[in-house]
From Swiss-Prot:
Cell compartment(s), UniProt: Cytoplasm
Chain's role: Could be a nuclease involved in processing of the 5'-end of pre-16S rRNA.
GO cellular component annotations of the record: cytosol
Enzyme Commission code(s) on record: 3.1.-.-
PANTHER family named in the record: POLYNUCLEOTIDYL TRANSFERASE, RIBONUCLEASE H-LIKE SUPERFAMILY PROTEIN (PTHR33317:SF4)
InterPro entries attached to this UniProt entry: RNaseH-like_sf, YqgF, YqgF/RNaseH-like_dom, YqgF/RNaseH-like_dom_sf
Organism per entry: Chloroflexus aggregans (strain MD-66 / DSM 9485)
Protein's recorded name: Putative pre-16S rRNA nuclease
GO molecular function: nuclease activity
GO biological process, one term: rRNA 5'-end processing
This protein's UniProt keywords: Cytoplasm, Hydrolase, Nuclease, Ribosome biogenesis
Highest taxon of source: Bacteria
Length: 142
């Protein structure tokens, strides 16, 4: 596989969780959480991370329903992805994010993270789950 660092995003109404892969695009790790508003500032921060980290692709979580249909947030995420893609010099794609926030919260609880700290970390952990699922799906497409 070509060496390429991939950024994963969990875009929420208030915050955007950010995760990053290793250069071999095998392992995802939480990176940071940035405010979602104003969107222009969030996009500028993401663009800066892409440039600083040598990111070759961005993966954004797509909120699907349990039936695999576009959820109520999907249109807003699509607008964000379109605006982000317009300023980046790398591909931006969406990937199913079903249940990632639930999994992230459970993971943090299992690690003994105090409830007050979970809110600070949940978005970037969810982004790392989205990105890891994406990386795994690329390696094992079936």
């Amino acid at each position: 596989m070509n060496e390429q660092t991939i950024l994963g995003l969990d875009v929420g109404e208030r915050r955007i969780g950010v995760a990053i892969s290793d250069v071999e695009a095998r392992i995802a790790a939480p990176l940071t959480t940035i405010p979602a508003h104003p969107p222009e500032r969030a996009i500028a921060q993401i663009a800066r991370l892409v440039a600083e980290r040598g990111v070759r692709r961005v993966v954004v979580g797509l909120p699907l329903t349990m039936r695999g249909e576009h959820g109520p947030q999907a249109a807003a995420i699509q607008r964000f992805v379109d605006a982000l893609a317009a300023v980046l010099n790398c591909p931006v794609e969406m990937f199913d994010e079903r249940l990632t926030s639930v999994a992230a919260e459970q993971m943090l609880r299992n690690l003994g993270v105090k409830p007050a700290k979970i809110k600070e970390q949940i978005d970037q952990v969810a982004a790392s789950i989205i990105l890891q699922d994406y990386l795994d799906a690329r390696r094992n497409p079936f």
